[in-house]
Amino acid sequence: MAATKLDGKLYRDEIFADLEQRVAALKEKGVTPGLATVLVGDDPASHSYVRMKHKDCEQIGVNSIRKDLPADVSQEELNAVIDELNADDACTGYIVQLPLPKHLDENAVLERIDPDKDADGLHPVNLGKLVLNEPAPLPCTPNGAIHLLRRFDVELNGAKVVVIGRGVTVGRPIGLMLTRRSENSTVTLCHTGTKDLAAETKAADVIVAAAGVPHMITADMVKPGAAILDVGVSRGEDGKLKGDVHPDVWDVAGAVSPNPGGVGPLTRAFLVRNVVERAEKLLRA
Protein backbone atom coordinates (compact mmCIF):
# COMPACT_ATOMS: atom_id res chain seq x y z
CA MET A 1 0.00 0.00 0.00
CA ALA A 2 1.36 3.41 -0.96
CA ALA A 3 2.43 5.77 1.81
CA THR A 4 0.42 8.79 2.90
CA LYS A 5 1.61 11.93 1.13
CA LEU A 6 2.75 14.56 3.63
CA ASP A 7 1.63 17.51 1.52
CA GLY A 8 2.98 20.77 2.91
CA LYS A 9 0.88 22.89 0.56
CA LEU A 10 -2.27 21.98 2.49
CA TYR A 11 -1.02 23.57 5.70
CA ARG A 12 0.95 26.37 4.08
CA ASP A 13 -2.36 27.87 2.97
CA GLU A 14 -3.71 27.52 6.51
CA ILE A 15 -0.74 29.47 7.90
CA PHE A 16 -0.97 32.07 5.14
CA ALA A 17 -4.65 32.71 5.90
CA ASP A 18 -3.76 33.40 9.53
CA LEU A 19 -0.86 35.66 8.52
CA GLU A 20 -3.04 37.67 6.12
CA GLN A 21 -5.35 38.57 9.02
CA ARG A 22 -2.44 39.46 11.28
CA VAL A 23 -0.79 41.64 8.63
CA ALA A 24 -4.10 43.42 7.99
CA ALA A 25 -4.37 44.13 11.74
CA LEU A 26 -0.81 45.51 11.77
CA LYS A 27 -1.54 47.77 8.81
CA GLU A 28 -4.59 49.19 10.60
CA LYS A 29 -2.14 50.34 13.28
CA GLY A 30 0.25 51.84 10.74
CA VAL A 31 2.76 48.98 10.61
CA THR A 32 3.65 47.10 7.42
CA PRO A 33 6.10 44.21 7.84
CA GLY A 34 8.94 44.01 5.30
CA LEU A 35 10.93 40.94 4.25
CA ALA A 36 14.20 41.35 2.37
CA THR A 37 16.24 38.74 0.53
CA VAL A 38 19.92 38.83 -0.39
CA LEU A 39 20.71 36.58 -3.35
CA VAL A 40 24.24 36.11 -4.69
CA GLY A 41 24.85 34.59 -8.12
CA ASP A 42 22.75 32.96 -10.82
CA ASP A 43 21.85 29.54 -9.41
CA PRO A 44 18.44 28.70 -10.94
CA ALA A 45 17.17 26.89 -7.84
CA SER A 46 18.08 29.80 -5.55
CA HIS A 47 16.42 32.27 -7.91
CA SER A 48 13.30 30.10 -7.93
CA TYR A 49 13.21 29.93 -4.12
CA VAL A 50 13.62 33.68 -3.77
CA ARG A 51 10.98 34.39 -6.40
CA MET A 52 8.49 32.20 -4.51
CA LYS A 53 9.28 33.96 -1.24
CA HIS A 54 8.46 37.34 -2.76
CA LYS A 55 5.28 35.91 -4.27
CA ASP A 56 4.30 34.77 -0.77
CA CYS A 57 4.89 38.30 0.55
CA GLU A 58 2.64 39.76 -2.13
CA GLN A 59 -0.13 37.30 -1.26
CA ILE A 60 0.02 38.03 2.47
CA GLY A 61 0.51 41.80 2.22
CA VAL A 62 4.12 41.97 3.40
CA ASN A 63 6.46 44.41 1.66
CA SER A 64 9.35 42.69 -0.09
CA ILE A 65 12.84 44.01 -0.78
CA ARG A 66 15.21 42.23 -3.19
CA LYS A 67 18.97 42.56 -3.18
CA ASP A 68 20.36 40.52 -6.09
CA LEU A 69 24.15 40.54 -6.33
CA PRO A 70 26.57 39.10 -8.92
CA ALA A 71 28.38 35.83 -8.23
CA ASP A 72 31.73 37.63 -8.00
CA VAL A 73 30.59 40.11 -5.36
CA SER A 74 33.29 40.76 -2.76
CA GLN A 75 32.91 40.09 0.96
CA GLU A 76 33.12 43.84 1.58
CA GLU A 77 30.34 44.59 -0.91
CA LEU A 78 28.11 41.91 0.60
CA ASN A 79 28.83 43.21 4.09
CA ALA A 80 27.73 46.68 2.97
CA VAL A 81 24.37 45.31 1.79
CA ILE A 82 23.86 43.52 5.11
CA ASP A 83 24.71 46.69 7.04
CA GLU A 84 22.21 48.59 4.90
CA LEU A 85 19.41 46.14 5.72
CA ASN A 86 20.32 46.14 9.41
CA ALA A 87 19.78 49.93 9.42
CA ASP A 88 16.65 49.97 7.22
CA ASP A 89 13.47 50.39 9.30
CA ALA A 90 11.37 49.23 6.33
CA CYS A 91 13.07 45.83 6.61
CA THR A 92 11.53 43.93 9.53
CA GLY A 93 13.55 40.81 8.78
CA TYR A 94 15.67 39.33 6.03
CA ILE A 95 17.54 36.30 4.80
CA VAL A 96 20.76 35.70 2.92
CA GLN A 97 20.02 32.87 0.49
CA LEU A 98 22.37 29.95 1.09
CA PRO A 99 24.65 28.46 -0.08
CA LEU A 100 26.94 31.34 -1.01
CA PRO A 101 29.78 31.13 -3.56
CA LYS A 102 32.87 29.52 -2.03
CA HIS A 103 34.93 32.73 -1.96
CA LEU A 104 32.51 34.22 0.59
CA ASP A 105 32.61 33.45 4.33
CA GLU A 106 29.13 32.13 5.14
CA ASN A 107 29.62 32.17 8.90
CA ALA A 108 30.84 35.77 8.86
CA VAL A 109 27.79 36.74 6.82
CA LEU A 110 25.36 35.06 9.23
CA GLU A 111 27.09 36.70 12.22
CA ARG A 112 26.78 40.14 10.61
CA ILE A 113 22.99 39.93 10.38
CA ASP A 114 21.14 41.78 13.15
CA PRO A 115 19.90 38.85 15.32
CA ASP A 116 16.52 40.58 15.72
CA LYS A 117 16.14 40.73 11.91
CA ASP A 118 17.28 37.14 11.38
CA ALA A 119 14.23 35.75 9.56
CA ASP A 120 15.92 32.37 8.96
CA GLY A 121 16.76 31.80 12.64
CA LEU A 122 20.38 30.96 11.76
CA HIS A 123 22.31 33.73 13.53
CA PRO A 124 24.68 32.27 16.16
CA VAL A 125 22.82 34.20 18.88
CA ASN A 126 19.48 32.69 17.87
CA LEU A 127 20.92 29.18 17.51
CA GLY A 128 22.43 29.63 20.96
CA LYS A 129 19.02 30.58 22.33
CA LEU A 130 17.63 27.42 20.77
CA VAL A 131 20.23 25.42 22.71
CA LEU A 132 19.20 27.24 25.90
CA ASN A 133 15.49 26.85 25.07
CA GLU A 134 14.98 30.62 25.14
CA PRO A 135 12.55 32.48 22.82
CA ALA A 136 14.08 33.39 19.45
CA PRO A 137 13.26 33.09 15.74
CA LEU A 138 13.30 29.38 14.92
CA PRO A 139 15.03 27.94 11.83
CA CYS A 140 12.34 27.75 9.17
CA THR A 141 12.93 24.34 7.60
CA PRO A 142 13.11 22.40 10.89
CA ASN A 143 10.07 24.31 12.14
CA GLY A 144 8.18 23.45 8.95
CA ALA A 145 9.24 19.80 9.14
CA ILE A 146 8.01 19.38 12.71
CA HIS A 147 4.76 21.22 11.93
CA LEU A 148 4.17 18.91 8.97
CA LEU A 149 4.63 15.79 11.11
CA ARG A 150 2.28 17.15 13.77
CA ARG A 151 -0.45 18.14 11.29
CA PHE A 152 -0.47 14.58 9.92
CA ASP A 153 -0.56 13.15 13.48
CA VAL A 154 2.85 11.50 13.29
CA GLU A 155 3.74 10.59 16.88
CA LEU A 156 6.87 12.37 18.09
CA ASN A 157 6.63 11.79 21.85
CA GLY A 158 9.09 8.98 22.57
CA ALA A 159 9.69 8.33 18.87
CA LYS A 160 13.09 7.25 17.58
CA VAL A 161 14.05 9.86 14.98
CA VAL A 162 17.07 9.51 12.70
CA VAL A 163 18.27 12.80 11.19
CA ILE A 164 20.69 12.50 8.27
CA GLY A 165 22.68 15.68 7.68
CA ARG A 166 24.77 17.96 9.86
CA GLY A 167 24.21 21.30 8.16
CA VAL A 168 23.30 24.46 10.04
CA THR A 169 20.02 24.95 8.15
CA VAL A 170 18.42 21.59 9.00
CA GLY A 171 20.45 18.77 10.53
CA ARG A 172 21.89 20.42 13.62
CA PRO A 173 18.91 22.59 14.63
CA ILE A 174 16.20 19.98 14.01
CA GLY A 175 17.94 17.64 16.43
CA LEU A 176 17.74 20.32 19.12
CA MET A 177 14.09 21.07 18.34
CA LEU A 178 13.01 17.41 18.38
CA THR A 179 14.54 16.87 21.82
CA ARG A 180 12.60 19.74 23.41
CA ARG A 181 10.03 18.58 25.96
CA SER A 182 7.25 19.64 23.58
CA GLU A 183 8.44 17.02 21.04
CA ASN A 184 10.25 14.62 23.39
CA SER A 185 11.81 12.50 20.65
CA THR A 186 14.99 10.45 20.91
CA VAL A 187 17.26 11.67 18.12
CA THR A 188 20.19 10.01 16.38
CA LEU A 189 22.15 12.45 14.20
CA CYS A 190 23.75 10.71 11.21
CA HIS A 191 25.62 12.03 8.18
CA THR A 192 27.49 10.91 5.08
CA GLY A 193 30.30 9.55 7.28
CA THR A 194 28.05 7.32 9.40
CA LYS A 195 29.02 3.64 9.34
CA ASP A 196 26.13 1.29 8.55
CA LEU A 197 23.55 4.01 8.06
CA ALA A 198 20.94 1.39 7.17
CA ALA A 199 21.17 -0.14 10.65
CA GLU A 200 20.21 3.25 12.10
CA THR A 201 17.41 4.03 9.66
CA LYS A 202 15.80 0.56 9.88
CA ALA A 203 15.21 1.14 13.59
CA ALA A 204 13.71 4.62 13.13
CA ASP A 205 10.07 5.62 13.51
CA VAL A 206 10.83 8.88 11.69
CA ILE A 207 13.62 9.66 9.22
CA VAL A 208 14.61 13.22 8.31
CA ALA A 209 16.80 13.03 5.19
CA ALA A 210 18.74 16.28 4.78
CA ALA A 211 22.17 15.24 3.50
CA GLY A 212 21.87 16.48 -0.08
CA VAL A 213 22.77 13.08 -1.59
CA PRO A 214 20.41 12.02 -4.41
CA HIS A 215 18.15 9.07 -3.52
CA MET A 216 20.39 7.90 -0.66
CA ILE A 217 17.45 6.50 1.33
CA THR A 218 16.07 3.37 -0.34
CA ALA A 219 13.23 1.02 0.54
CA ASP A 220 15.51 -1.60 2.11
CA MET A 221 16.70 1.02 4.64
CA VAL A 222 13.23 1.82 5.98
CA LYS A 223 11.10 0.17 8.66
CA PRO A 224 7.59 -0.60 7.36
CA GLY A 225 5.21 2.18 8.38
CA ALA A 226 7.89 4.74 9.22
CA ALA A 227 7.43 8.45 8.43
CA ILE A 228 10.01 9.92 6.04
CA LEU A 229 10.76 13.61 5.47
CA ASP A 230 12.71 14.28 2.27
CA VAL A 231 14.43 17.62 2.87
CA GLY A 232 17.69 17.29 0.92
CA VAL A 233 18.08 18.81 -2.54
CA SER A 234 20.92 18.14 -4.98
CA ARG A 235 21.53 17.58 -8.67
CA GLY A 236 21.80 14.05 -10.00
CA GLU A 237 24.11 12.92 -12.79
CA ASP A 238 21.41 13.93 -15.27
CA GLY A 239 21.56 17.52 -13.97
CA LYS A 240 18.03 17.40 -12.52
CA LEU A 241 17.19 18.33 -8.94
CA LYS A 242 16.54 15.30 -6.75
CA GLY A 243 15.65 14.65 -3.14
CA ASP A 244 17.45 12.33 -0.73
CA VAL A 245 14.68 9.70 -0.79
CA HIS A 246 14.34 7.11 -3.56
CA PRO A 247 10.82 6.68 -5.02
CA ASP A 248 10.72 3.01 -3.95
CA VAL A 249 10.46 4.15 -0.31
CA TRP A 250 6.80 5.02 -0.92
CA ASP A 251 6.02 1.28 -1.11
CA VAL A 252 7.33 0.62 2.40
CA ALA A 253 6.88 3.77 4.49
CA GLY A 254 3.68 4.81 6.21
CA ALA A 255 4.07 8.48 5.27
CA VAL A 256 6.46 10.38 3.00
CA SER A 257 6.90 14.08 2.26
CA PRO A 258 7.36 14.67 -1.49
CA ASN A 259 10.26 16.77 -2.72
CA PRO A 260 9.32 19.35 -3.90
CA GLY A 261 5.97 20.05 -2.23
CA GLY A 262 6.51 18.58 1.22
CA VAL A 263 8.50 20.60 3.74
CA GLY A 264 9.40 23.41 1.30
CA PRO A 265 6.04 25.23 1.32
CA LEU A 266 6.07 25.28 5.12
CA THR A 267 9.65 26.55 5.19
CA ARG A 268 8.45 29.58 3.26
CA ALA A 269 5.40 29.98 5.50
CA PHE A 270 7.47 30.02 8.68
CA LEU A 271 9.93 32.46 7.13
CA VAL A 272 7.15 35.00 6.64
CA ARG A 273 5.70 34.17 10.05
CA ASN A 274 9.02 35.02 11.72
CA VAL A 275 8.87 38.45 10.07
CA VAL A 276 5.24 39.07 11.02
CA GLU A 277 5.91 38.02 14.62
CA ARG A 278 8.79 40.49 14.85
CA ALA A 279 6.53 43.28 13.54
CA GLU A 280 3.97 42.41 16.21
CA LYS A 281 6.69 42.39 18.87
CA LEU A 282 7.93 45.83 17.77
CA LEU A 283 4.38 47.19 17.93
CA ARG A 284 3.90 45.88 21.48
CA ALA A 285 7.19 47.48 22.52
Swiss-Prot record:
GO annotation terms (biological process): L-histidine biosynthetic process; methionine biosynthetic process; purine nucleotide biosynthetic process; tetrahydrofolate interconversion
Keywords (A to Z) from UniProt: Amino-acid biosynthesis, Histidine biosynthesis, Hydrolase, Methionine biosynthesis, Multifunctional enzyme, NADP, One-carbon metabolism, Oxidoreductase, Purine biosynthesis
SUPFAM superfamilies (UniProt xref): Aminoacid dehydrogenase-like, N-terminal domain (SSF53223), NAD(P)-binding Rossmann-fold domains (SSF51735)
UniProt-listed Pfam families: THF_DHG_CYH (PF00763), THF_DHG_CYH_C (PF02882)
Pathway(s) where this gene product acts: One-carbon metabolism; tetrahydrofolate interconversion
Residue numbers binding NADP(+): G165, R166, G167, T192, V233
InterPro entries assigned to the protein according to its UniProt record, in alphabetical order: Aminoacid_DH-like_N_sf, NAD(P)-bd_dom_sf, THF_DH/CycHdrlase, THF_DH/CycHdrlase_cat_dom, THF_DH/CycHdrlase_NAD-bd_dom
Coiled-coil regions listed in the entry: none
UniProt-listed Enzyme Commission number(s): 1.5.1.5, 3.5.4.9
Similarity-based family: Belongs to the tetrahydrofolate dehydrogenase/cyclohydrolase family.
Oligomeric form and interacting partners: Homodimer.
Name of the protein in question: Bifunctional protein FolD
Source organism of this protein record: Corynebacterium jeikeium (strain K411)
Top-level taxonomy: Bacteria, Bacillati, Actinomycetota, Actinomycetes, Mycobacteriales
Designated gene of the protein: folD
